């Protein structure tokens, strides 16, 4: 069994999708050790509890520095013998302490066809751009914002009659297929 930890900051729909793939056996030989979140009121906590997944709530403001915050996370991850970190809507840049401890073992999913539309509101950026396609990207995490090596992408059309909400649903559907597929290929 490969032990993974999933990091999320918000609703946790990608987190729950991965957990459901593990529970159903579609993601074999993977154990989700815990959800790590940086917001005490994040909805992902409710999703984790529903699936009996332990939750670590660590808000960076509780620590003297980003280094202290990340060193605390590394100690928790090491206690659980975590081998891979899966970012699923975790809205913080990963710093040098976490990167050094899990080099080449941190994945992220981003709702655009990187390198386009890095950062926040990527779907909104694509929607307002005039582009006719967008999509989702899974990539390795490095010290930049959505700059790590791209592993795989999936795309969808942006139709003239799509609302932003419809486009968000299209991209979310891609993510729900893409992330478990990449995890199955990479996390071993």
Curated annotation (Swiss-Prot):
GO terms for biological process: 'de novo' IMP biosynthetic process. Catalyzes the transfer of a formyl group from 10-formyltetrahydrofolate to 5-phospho-ribosyl-glycinamide (GAR), producing 5-phospho-ribosyl-N-formylglycinamide (FGAR) and tetrahydrofolate. Keywords: Purine biosynthesis, Transferase. Pfam families: Formyl_trans_N. Belongs to the GART family. One of its GO terms (cellular component) is cytosol. The active site is at 110 (proton donor). The record marks 146 as: Raises pKa of active site His. CDD domains: FMT_core_GART (cd08645). GO terms for molecular function: phosphoribosylglycinamide formyltransferase activity. Pathway: Purine metabolism; IMP biosynthesis via de novo pathway; N(2)-formyl-N(1)-(5-phospho-D-ribosyl)glycinamide from N(1)-(5-phospho-D-ribosyl)glycinamide (10-formyl THF route): step 1/1. The keyword Coiled coil does not apply. This is Phosphoribosylglycinamide formyltransferase. InterPro entries: Formyl_transf_N, Formyl_transf_N_sf, GART. It comes from Staphylococcus aureus (strain MSSA476). Its EC number is 2.1.2.2. N(1)-(5-phospho-beta-D-ribosyl)glycinamide binds at residues 12-14. It catalyses: N(1)-(5-phospho-beta-D-ribosyl)glycinamide + (6R)-10-formyltetrahydrofolate = N(2)-formyl-N(1)-(5-phospho-beta-D-ribosyl)glycinamide + (6S)-5,6,7,8-tetrahydrofolate + H(+). (6R)-10-formyltetrahydrofolate binds at residues 66, 91-94, 108. It comes from the Bacteria.
């Amino acid at each position: 069994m490969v032990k993974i930890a999933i990091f999320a900051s918000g609703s946790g729909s990608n987190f729950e999708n991965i957990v459901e793939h593990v529970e159903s056996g579609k993601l074999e030989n993977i154990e989700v050790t815990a959800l790590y979140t940086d917001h005490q009121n994040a909805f992902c906590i409710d999703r984790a509890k529903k699936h009996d997944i332990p939750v670590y709530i660590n808000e960076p403001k509780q620590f003297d520095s980003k280094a202290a915050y990340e060193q605390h996370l590394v100690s928790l991850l090491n206690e659980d013998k975590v081998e891979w970190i899966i970012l699923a809507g975790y809205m913080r840049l990963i710093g040098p302490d976490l990167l050094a401890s899990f080099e080449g073992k941190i994945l992220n999913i981003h709702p655009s066809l990187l390198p386009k539309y890095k950062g926040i509101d990527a779907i909104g950026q694509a929607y307002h751009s005039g582009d006719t396609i967008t999509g989702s990207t899974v990539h390795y995490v490095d010290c930049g914002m959505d700059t790590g090596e791209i592993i795989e992408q999936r795309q969808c059309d942006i139709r003239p009659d799509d609302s932003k909400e419809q486009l968000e649903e299209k991209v979310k559907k891609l993510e729900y297929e893409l992330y478990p597929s990449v995890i199955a290929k990479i996390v071993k």
